[in-house]
Structure formats: structure tokens, C-alpha cells
């Protein structure tokens, strides 16, 4: 490729920076001469571009091979962009798929302090039972499958803090109101990979729930499949958990 002439055009300079970024992203690591040849730029120009990327923290040089590669700052930047992506835009197709497979009500919630907020719901496709849950509803964590799924990702100290700051009351005869029992249940959730609401919030309603793990360390979202115990049998729950 013919060598391009130097220019002070800021647009072209930016273009070259991104060309180097894209090339390193594609190849993993490259030497100065490789990049220079591929882009058709003088070695001094490429070296200056690489030094700029290293200075800004987007690239690094292997001291042994002298080759250049991208740093994890790029990954961090991508993660921040993805965190801001509308969760519903990502989750809706999967929630609809779960609804089609199960025929039951499907919920998506996000954590709001010590509570959960329902942000999306698909009603059951079978039967006439309608649960009290609805979009915009705020609910305590301790007596729901989605809440327990989120709590299971938290350290014990934070779980106990949520518990102590919540009003713990019996919603049904099966609601867990003992912290030691809850800690045992959360351990089972971690082991199984899903949480169960076994008529703890509404009599006659059983839910299976799991977290949505994103690009940040903090788990903010969880989803559930909920239905009457006559359809959400133990066997059915195990099938849906697979």
C-alpha cells in the first residue's frame, strides 16, 4: 500500500487512531512494522499514534516482544456503555420466549434499595388466574423468588442489613420470617442456581426465579416464571430450571 502523507487534519488523525484500535482489536497484538505496513503509514506516525494510545491507557506494549495490544480500559468502556443499555430492550425477547415455553406469567424486576420494582410483566397464556403483581409495584425482597435470587448474590452482612431494615411479616403460612432459615434458603439458591417462591407471597402461587448477570459486579435484575401450584408442580419447576 502506498505511504500516505503526513497531515495535521484533526479528522484524519482521529481516523488513524481508530484504525489502530480496530487493528489491535482484530489481531490481538502487533509489532510497529506490521501496523505501519498494514495502514500504509510511516513508522514514526504509527509510533506517535501508539504512544498516544498508551498515554491515554487504551494500549500497552509487551516489554519482551515489543508488540502492542489493547488494554482492559477498552473493556471497561464497553461495559459502561452496555450497562446503560435499556434492560427491557435486551430482555424482552427472552421473556417472551419464556412465556411461550411455559405458558405462565413472566416477570422482570430490578432492585430498588431493600425492595424490588416490577418493570415488566407478561400475563399467563393459560388459565384465568391473575396475580396481584403489576408493573410499577414495589415489593420486599424476603418473600419473593426474584428477591431471594438477588439476595443470594449478596454478602451475608448486606443480607442481614436488608432483613433488619425490612418489615418482616407473614404474607402466607409459608412466608419465611426467621433470618437463620432465610440464610439456609439462600445457600440452597446459590447451590441450585435459582430461587423458589413456594406460596410465600401469594397462596396457591409458586414461582421460580433467577438473576440476570450483567457487565457490572452488582446484580440489579431478576426474572421469574409464576403460576398456580396446580400447574407449577415440583416436577414442572425442575423442568423449567434446566
Locations of the language-model features?
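N-terminal helix-turn-helix
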Residues: 2-89
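Short, conserved catalytic or interaction motifs in soluble domains
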Residues: 26, 124, 214
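Extended hydrophobic
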Residues: 174-242
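A structural microfeature
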Residues: 57, 118-120, 221
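Amphipathic alpha-helical effector-binding/dimerization core
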Residues: 65, 69-165
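Short, acidic, Ser/Thr-enriched surface-loop or helix-capping motifs
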Residues: 63, 111, 213-215
Amino acid at each position: 500500500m502506498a505511504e500516505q502523507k503526513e497531515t495535521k487534519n484533526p479528522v484524519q488523525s482521529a481516523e488513524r487512531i481508530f484504525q489502530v484500535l480496530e487493528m489491535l482489536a482484530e489481531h490481538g497484538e502487533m509489532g510497529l512494522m506490521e501496523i505501519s505496513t498494514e495502514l500504509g503509514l510511516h513508522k514514526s506516525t504509527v509510533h506517535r499514534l501508539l504512544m498516544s494510545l498508551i498515554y491515554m491507557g487504551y494500549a500497552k506494549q509487551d516489554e519482551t516482544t515489543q508488540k502492542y495490544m489493547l488494554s482492559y480500559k477498552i473493556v471497561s468502556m464497553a461495559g459502561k456503555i452496555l450497562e446503560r443499555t435499556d434492560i427491557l430492550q435486551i430482555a424482552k425477547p427472552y421473556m417472551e420466549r419464556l412465556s411461550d415455553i411455559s405458558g405462565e406469567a413472566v416477570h422482570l424486576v430490578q432492585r430498588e434499595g431493600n425492595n424490588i420494582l416490577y418493570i415488566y410483566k407478561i400475563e399467563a397464556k393459560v388459565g384465568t388466574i391473575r396475580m396481584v403483581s403489576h408493573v410499577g409495584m414495589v415489593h420486599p425482597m424476603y418473600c419473593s423468588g426474584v428477591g431471594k435470587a438477588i439476595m443470594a448474590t449478596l454478602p451475608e452482612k448486606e443480607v442481614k442489613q436488608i432483613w433488619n431494615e425490612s418489615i418482616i411479616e407473614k404474607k402466607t403460612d409459608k412466608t419465611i420470617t426467621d433470618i437463620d432459615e432465610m440464610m439456609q434458603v439462600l445457600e440452597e439458591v446459590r447451590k441450585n442456581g435459582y430461587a423458589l417462591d413456594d406460596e410465600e407471597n401469594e397462596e396457591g402461587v409458586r414461582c421460580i426465579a433467577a438473576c440476570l448477570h450483567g457487565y457490572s459486579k452488582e446484580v440489579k435484575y431478576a426474572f421469574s416464571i409464576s403460576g398456580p401450584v396446580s400447574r407449577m408442580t415440583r416436577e414442572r419447576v425442575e423442568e423449567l430450571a434446566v
